[in-house]
Amino acid sequence: MAGRVKNVRQVLGEAAAPLTRLAELPGRGVTRVWECAGPPGAETLMLIHGVTFTAELNWGKVFAPLSRDFRVIAIDLRGHGDGIKTGSRFRLEDCADDVAALAEALDITRFVAVGYSMGGMIAQLLFKRHASRLSGLVLCATARNVLGSPIERMAALALPTAAAAIQWNPLLQPMSAEFFGMTLLGSVDDPATARWARAQLRRTTLATAISAVRAVSEFTSHSWIGEVDVPTAVVVTTRDRIVPVSRQMKLARAIPGASVHEIAADHAVCTTAPQVFTPVLLEACWSVEARRIRQQPA
């Protein structure tokens, strides 16, 4: 592997977009990074994918449209795809710190964090932990928390036991996150897309998936999300089976000045119907960019 791993800045400056390589984040590990260069001087969007997905599966169909106006960067989160190897427990805070470390490695002073589902929670944590680096937020199909009802709390209680069973049973460790991921995807009409999605999901282990779902179930930003002071857009998937619309809207209402961009689609529209998702995502990013520019000193 040593011959394939390069410094992040070297990797992303070598070729025209879209470019993907394994790259090293100093002191943290090796991950896969994608970049579309965008126009000279364009604002940077840092794309953060959802649980069990990879950057390619979550964002692959929007790289090119976004890059017409923005510099676009995406990372495989730790434990997912070619992401940094994770330990016995997956932490959203570690993922947020990885994204900030990538920005540091690339000399990116500030960026717009664009997070999808679990990635939206990581984007929220970027504000909490690395606010000086954020120029905006785009939060898609996500919430302040997903663990509220008694049934959801009961389900979450089983996750530590399941994670421990996999950790101590060698026969279970090679199992992939395909089941979890296909549940999130829902119906996929195109057979080629379904095959591609399954192949991507198999690159994440079941143990990581369970640990990540547990981290998502424990996340809450209720006490501090109202402190967000950067331009924010919330993309609401109004037919979502995974994150209730009511929770997505509560997130939007909790953030001062957040714009809402509705899309009549299920949770994984980013993958199952990118032609529907892309215009709404672009609208959300343009909204944040317009407000960011207005806030700049004259």
Residue ranges and their predicted role:
Residues 60, 64-67, 73-114:
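Active-site loop/oxyanion-hole signature of alpha/beta-hydrolase fold enzymes
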Residues 128, 135-167:
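Flexible "cap/lid" loop of the alpha/beta hydrolase fold
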Residues 221, 230, 244-252:
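Short alpha-helix in the alpha/beta-hydrolase fold that links the catalytic acid
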Residues 228, 234-236, 240:
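Short beta-strand/loop motif that positions the catalytic acidic residue
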Residues 258-298:
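Catalytic active-site module of serine/aspartate enzymes centered on a nucleophile-bearing elbow/loop
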Residues 238-243, 268:
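Acidic catalytic loop of the alpha/beta-hydrolase fold
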Residues 29-82:
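Conserved HGGG/HGGXW glycine-rich cap/lid loop of the alpha/beta-hydrolase fold
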Residues 148-153, 169-226:
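Conserved alpha/beta-hydrolase catalytic His-Asp/Glu region
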